[in-house]
Regions:
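Acidic beta-strand-loop-alpha-helix segment within the catalytic core
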Residues: 1-94, 142-157
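Oxyanion/phosphate-interacting regions
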Residues: 73-78, 92-157
């Protein structure tokens, strides 16, 4: 990831198992996927509010299999009959980028190096990655190059 003024402005993520390369960011306002030999531009977020997304019945939410704690379960339980998409690592961001989920709640520890590149790709598509304070989503974006590289909890949408 390329970070400027504490914000991820460009990222590149390759997933060898899936042979997918994602790249893009806010500098260009777009993101791309190379899947094997095929290259396609990823679609921009519809920029729906988190409140509106949570209210939609059957909204796809991507969550970790191994880090699904009580806070994550409580968030999911507050949604309207969501469809859970399980995925590991920072690939959860990329599930949003591909349009296969609309919310990624993260209520477990991550480090900046775990999230920055995929976060940049998402932000290039107009998605939000807001921190959670006191168990509640804020309108504050996740920052990088902090003194403590541990990320706060966040929700991407």
């Amino acid at each position: 990831a390329l970070i400027q003024n504490n914000k991820p402005i460009y990222g590149v993520v390759y997933t060898p198992v899936l042979d997918k390369l994602f790249y893009g960011g806010t500098q260009t306002g777009e993101a791309w996927l190379i899947n094997g030999e095929a290259k396609s531009q990823l679609q921009h977020s519809k920029q729906e509010s988190l409140v509106d997304l949570i209210a939609q019945e059957g909204i796809p939410i991507v969550a970790s299999r191994s880090h699904r704690n009580k806070d994550t379960e409580d968030f999911i339980d507050g949604c309207n009959n969501p469809i859970i998409v399980s995925m590991g690592s920072s690939l959860k961001f990329l599930v949003l980028a591909e349009g296969n989920a609309h919310i990624y709640p993260r209520f477990a520890p991550t480090m900046e190096w775990d999230t920055a590149a995929a976060d940049a790709v998402l932000r290039g598509l107009g998605y939000n990655v807001f921190i959670v304070e006191g168990g509640k989503p804020t309108q504050k974006p996740l920052d990088y190059n902090k003194e403590d590289l541990l990320n706060p909890y966040f929700i991407a949408h």
